[in-house]
């Protein structure tokens, strides 16, 4: 899905432009070529992916071409949400760069998963890891740039989770504009960005309010001429409603997690995250709640989905992009279930699994950070 734009009227298949960029991939011992542009065209309704003659097994029907997303740039391989991680993902070949956004005290959009500096990642000028997080809304960009985020804190739980991550000391937190510059330098005119607003309604003091946050992001996207290359995701649905009103051309991706302790949605009661669109109002159905809110894509925790919920989302015209899947067995199972895309810390493994399923892969766009 690079990424997809799904029209409200199902049943019509169209692509907005000809296939003008090919990439060579290997599937079942055969070479398969695909146009990267084919997966970036505007999709007006239901697009059913057909199997290639050399495909090892018939693929399930999807609403859109499969979307291979590098979570935080592929944090199992390079420092997360940094120019090195995004450059590595582009050089490897992905459909979408997934990343997160915060806004500094002086109004600059920066790329970071937390709402502030992460003690497991950020080292000050003295070389020591910070002891507590500091929200970006309390720091200027100049202050943020003083911190080194190129190496996980040794012997931390985070380091144990990603033992293969290549440390790159001296790496700084990038601005979103710097990521756009990297994408331009790569020459990849088809890769898209799935950008998340990091706002927590239960901690309103740790970020801008939703309206101010969205305004900053949309102003930057328009100034950089990137509105056509992004989709905006969030667990805080208030921000997505604002995006839909102010920039309806940008697809909104509704993130959900039902599992404790970090759930943002409940099937039987209201949640501060869902802006009043609680599943309890829609027969306990998360896809119906997303559709009612105006969502274009549903992005659930992969453990939360079933074949039934995927089918229900597809009937509603909602592609399903699951997160965060790092085990090849889970990747294979979810692809067979018919998900429309996978967000992964291991885009390299996801490429291998997808190729084995006969899914055409995006071509590489080598670039240095």
Q: What is the meaning of each model-derived region?
A:
Residues 1-33:
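N-terminal secretory signal peptides that target proteins for export/translocation
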Residues 9, 46-47, 315:
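N-terminal secretion targeting segments of exported proteins
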Residues 21, 26, 33, 38, ...:
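Phosphate-group recognition and catalysis centered on beta-loop-alpha active-site segments
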Residues 39-47:
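Bacterial N-terminal signal peptides
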